[in-house]
């Protein structure tokens, strides 16, 4: 597995070629204003990364708000370009990561807790509360941390069912079951 970080820049900040007037607006992200409405019915991530907020180019930082309705999960995933620092602002969350020796480090977070997920390691968050939502804010040590969702990576990319069945020591019928739920909707 290759792990990389953002390169250092030689200027205070990087202005995209299509931006001619640099003022406070360039350094302001307004995409999280929508969070002030109702709560979503499915797990939702609102990101402020390089794609959404070009001022982050070269700054080695990004941000995400994670909204967990009752009983929802952010499935096992990795961020190959950054570590993650998660701050819980509402509810409770089960969180954890698995290191390169296959050891699970997990914790039940309460409001105000901060948890660190090391760069490139598989991790998850789960709101096991059946009544109340949870909200967390994550920061990343990269303007473009990228996310690799393991369920999608394994079951929607065309990896041969025989390879998956042998890898999971199961049969092809068992491998096909999660593919149905993960298939893109028309």
Where are these regions (language model features)?
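Double-stranded beta-helix
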Residues: 11-12, 103, 107, 116, ...
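Conserved beta-strand elements of beta-rich interaction domains across eukaryotes
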Residues: 1, 70-73, 92-93, 114, ...
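Beta-strand elements of modular eukaryotic interaction domains
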Residues: 52-55, 75-77, 113-114, 126-127
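Short acidic-glycine-tyrosine-enriched beta hairpin
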Residues: 56-58, 99-120
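Extracellular/periplasmic catalytic domains that process cell-envelope and extracellular macromolecules
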Residues: 58, 78-80, 86-88, 116, ...
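Glycine- and acidic-residue-biased ligand/ion/polar-headgroup-sensing regions
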Residues: 69-73, 79-101, 111
